[in-house]
Amino acid sequence: MLSSQANSQDTTTTTKTTGKLIEFLSAESYNIKKIDSQDFLVLVGHVKIKQGNTFLYGDSIIVNTTKNSLEGFGKVHINDADSVHTYADYLIYDGNTKKAKLRKHVKLTDGRGTLTTDSLDYDVSIKIGVYKKGGKLVRNKTILKSIEGVYYGITRDVLFRNKVSLIDPDNSIFTDTLEYNTYSQLANFISPSKIISGSRIIKTKNGNYNIGTKKGYLYERSSIDDSSYFFIADEMAIDDSLGLGEFRGNALYKSKDSLSFDLLANNIKANRKKDILLATELPILMIKQSKDTMYITADTLYSGRLTDLKRKMPKVRAKEEALKDSSLNKYFEAFHHVKIYSDSLQGVADSLFYGLADSTIRLHKNPILWANQNQITGDTIYMLLNNKKAEQLNILNNAMAISAVDSTDYFNQLKGNSIVVDFVDGKMHQMQTKGSAENIYFATDSEEKFIGVNHSNAQIITIDFKTDEPVKIVYTNQLTGKMTPLFELPKSELKLNNFKWLIDFKPLSKFDILSPKGK
């Protein structure tokens, strides 16, 4: 069987075949054999073989010169004159198709990533490798594993399938199908995927995340679940290196702290490092209460930390505690076409500021509030909350309260420099005005028939309410006024100066605050 033998050969031998030639370049020894009418070249020791631009190496290689194929053993190495190198303990190579079967301790490197498996089928001509019995790709500190995978050498993409995991120092990704590029480090999600980073869990079905730049784009209603918040939107763009995010299309932000608020919009931009939220395109802030929810909408809603405010808000409460709870270190601002709706209170204004530390909502520029049938206006209105329910209203400058009397065109009215309204269990309990106080009150008899109009002035006027209806009026200091029969007064004297009944601007439901009415 042994035709010839040579040691430390460096002679080139060319196989006789109609296909692309396999060239024997060097080996420590070789044998030529003929078995069943097939010719074999047995090469041993630092074997080097060439086919076109493809080089093959091994401890020993048997070349079937008849079929233009070979079998390699020990430290097998294939390189196609590029940066992709494959290694294995065992190789079967078809020189006609340039397809290789690598087995045992298989390794593929492309200069950036290293793929290891126990079985790899590799097409040298198109640089595609396939494994089906488990594989691992390592790129720096990033490790990817799956049961099946396909490596594309031209694009440097790897398609992982079946029990896929990607682990790096910052993220752990679990999915069924994942595409990863060893050069750009871009991971593409094409099946339901979970991305875990500390306490944060991202769920997506479609999108991508760059392990190197920490930037990602997620689609098809992806979500982010963290210890303090939950985000969901049709589309997301995130930058973990800067802590930034943009959420588009039916975006919802839900807080998980004791404040329990939700923010909805078609566009929300977030800065996690500075705790900033900017919502546009029909934004709605929902402040949850035990039995009621307050809805606030505007052209723009903004949230940030109180400690980052450059301007200081004037104190409203007589005693304000130091900011100890970090969850209270937050404020909301609303700009332009502000609307408020809850079961007990409704309102509109041009701008709003809500500081969580003092639980006060400040309404500016033509604010109007409605408490059942009572309309309240002033230059500025402060709404003091207790457990997120209205506890008190402070109406500053040009304060006026108006309520319709039944379904008539008559209105009870109260006017002064300022008005304070106290609530008990969400209902009006008392209203008091100070400074140039003036009121018009339509008195009725026991049968609810009008008996006259009381037009009075005093330094202080206090009105007590029961079930939102006035039951008692007290005038303090410098009282002047009189009761006049209704039919004796012209209509012009039935209304105080600057009277404006603005019921058409009142939001009637949580859906109504999204309508353009009142703009």
Region locations from a protein language model:
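N-terminal amphipathic/hydrophobic interface segments
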Residues: N7-K519
